[in-house]
C-alpha cells in the first residue's frame, strides 16, 4: 500500500477549565478537509514547539496548513498599533508560526494559509495588517455573525466571491475563475509582503 503525504496542521493555544488549563487544538473542519479533500494524513503541530525542534518536525512533513483561529497576530510583529486589552492573543502560536514559515519556504515545502494563516504568511515576509476591518467605512464587514444563537451553518456559509489570478492553482484545479468563500475576519492585509 502506498503511503500518503503527511501534513502538519498548526494548533491554537486555548484556555479551558475556567482559565486553569491551556490546550492545543485545531478546528475539526480543518482536519477533515486535510484528510478528506486533500487525502493526506494530518498531524497536529503544537503552538509552542521549540524553534530548535522545528527541523526534526518538518523532516517528517510534506506540507503545513496554517489554520484560522480566534486570536489575532500581535501587532508588534508588523509595526501595528497595540490591541485593546480585550483582544484575544496567542503569543506562542505567533512565535511558532513565524518561525515555521521561513523554514518551509527554505525547504520548498508547501504551506496553505487559511484566514489567520494567510495573515501570518504576509507578516512573516514583512507585510502589515489592518485591524478591525469592519470599522472602515469602505470595507466589507467580514466578521462572523454577532448573535450568540447563530448555527454553524450560518457562521460558515459562503459570504462573498473571490476571483482567482490568471495562473492560480485553484483556478486550474477547480476549473473556474471565481469561487464563493466564507469570511470570519477582523483583519485584512494592509501592505502585502514583497515576497
Residues covered by each model-derived region:
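N-terminal beta1-alpha1 cap of cysteine-dependent amidohydrolase-like domains
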Residues: 1-112, 123-130, 134-177, 186, ...
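Conserved G/P- and acidic residue-centered "switch" motifs that form tight phosphate/ATP-binding loops
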Residues: 115
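Hydrophobic, aromatic-enriched interface-forming segments
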Residues: 118-122
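Short beta-strand segments
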Residues: 182-184
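A short, hydrophobic C-terminal helix/tail in secreted or cell-surface proteins
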Residues: 191-195
Amino acid at each position: 500500500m502506498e503511503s500518503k503525504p503527511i501534513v502538519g496542521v498548526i494548533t491554537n493555544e486555548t484556555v479551558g477549565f475556567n482559565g486553569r488549563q491551556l490546550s492545543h487544538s485545531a478546528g475539526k473542519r480543518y482536519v477533515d478537509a486535510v484528510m478528506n479533500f486533500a487525502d493526506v494524513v494530518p498531524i497536529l503541530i503544537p503552538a509552542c514547539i521549540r524553534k530548535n525542534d522545528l527541523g526534526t518536525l518538518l523532516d517528517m512533513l510534506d506540507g503545513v496548513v496554517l489554520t484560522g483561529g480566534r486570536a489575532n497576530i500581535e501587532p508588534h510583529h508588523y509595526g501595528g498599533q497595540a490591541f485593546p486589552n480585550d483582544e484575544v492573543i496567542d503569543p506562542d502560536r505567533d512565535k511558532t508560526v513565524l518561525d515555521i514559515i521561513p523554514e518551509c519556504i527554505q525547504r520548498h515545502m508547501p504551506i496553505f494559509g487559511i484566514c489567520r494563516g494567510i495573515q501570518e504568511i504576509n507578516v512573516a515576509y514583512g507585510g502589515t495588517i489592518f485591524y478591525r476591518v469592519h470599522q472602515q467605512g469602505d470595507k466589507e464587514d467580514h466578521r462572523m455573525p454577532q448573535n450568540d444563537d447563530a448555527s454553524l451553518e450560518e457562521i460558515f456559509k459562503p459570504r462573498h466571491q473571490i476571483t482567482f489570478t490568471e495562473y492560480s492553482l485553484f483556478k486550474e484545479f477547480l476549473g473556474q475563475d471565481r469561487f464563493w468563500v466564507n469570511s470570519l475576519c477582523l483583519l485584512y492585509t494592509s501592505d502585502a509582503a514583497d515576497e
